[in-house]
Amino acid sequence: MAEAETALQMAARHVAEQEARVREQEELVARSQREGRPTDQAEGMLAEMGNMLDAIRDHLERLRQTREE
């Protein structure tokens, strides 16, 4: 039976997953730009995804600091 994921492991996984989503969205924006399609909505979504990534990274850092104390 697999061990339960710790809060720190889960936060690290969430960071990695969100980084992958951001990369995919960046690729979508770039492809749309190359094809001459509007990118306003895709760029707005990318900005929101970046904000979420920042928040998740902050949470991970707080967990790491708590663990070190």
Residue ranges and their predicted role:
Residues M1-E69:
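Anionic, Ser/Thr-rich low-complexity intrinsically disordered regions
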